[in-house]
C-alpha cells in the first residue's frame, strides 16, 4: 500500500559551470512529493500523515527552506537535490519515491 504527501519550500541556487541563464542566482518554489510504501499496522495506517509531516519537516524542510542551495550542495541540480532528499528520508521511513518539482512544469523522480 502506498500513501503520499505533498510539501512546498522556497530556495535559491545557481548552477556552477552552466552556460544558460541558470548560472545566475535565482529562486524556485519547489514542490516535494513523498510516497511511502508498506503494510498497514495495527492502527490501520502505513504511517500517520502527521508523523510523515514531522519527519519531512525535520529532515528536509528545516534544512532547505529559504536557503541558498549552493551552500548545501556542490552542484544544486534538481537531480542532486532529489537524490539527497531520497537518501536522507529513506534512513527514517520506507520510501517508495520522491518527486521534486522545480517550478510548475519541471520535475525529477527517484523510485526505490
Identify the residue ranges that each predicted region occupies.
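Charge-rich, low-complexity N-terminal segments
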Residues: 1-112
Amino acid at each position: 500500500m502506498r500513501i503520499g504527501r505533498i510539501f512546498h519550500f522556497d530556495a535559491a541556487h545557481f548552477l556552477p559551470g552552466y552556460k544558460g541563464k541558470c548560472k545566475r542566482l535565482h529562486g524556485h518554489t519547489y514542490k516535494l512529493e513523498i510516497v511511502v510504501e508498506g503494510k498497514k499496522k495495527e492502527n490501520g495506517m502505513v504511517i500517520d500523515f502527521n508523523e510523515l509531516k514531522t519527519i519531512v519537516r525535520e529532515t528536509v524542510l528545516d534544512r532547505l527552506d529559504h536557503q541558498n542551495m549552493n551552500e548545501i550542495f556542490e552542484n544544486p541540480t534538481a537531480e542532486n537535490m532529489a537524490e539527497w532528499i531520497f537518501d536522507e528520508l529513506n534512513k527514517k521511513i520506507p520510501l517508495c519515491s520522491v518527486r521534486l518539482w522545480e517550478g510548475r512544469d519541471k520535475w525529477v523522480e527517484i523510485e526505490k
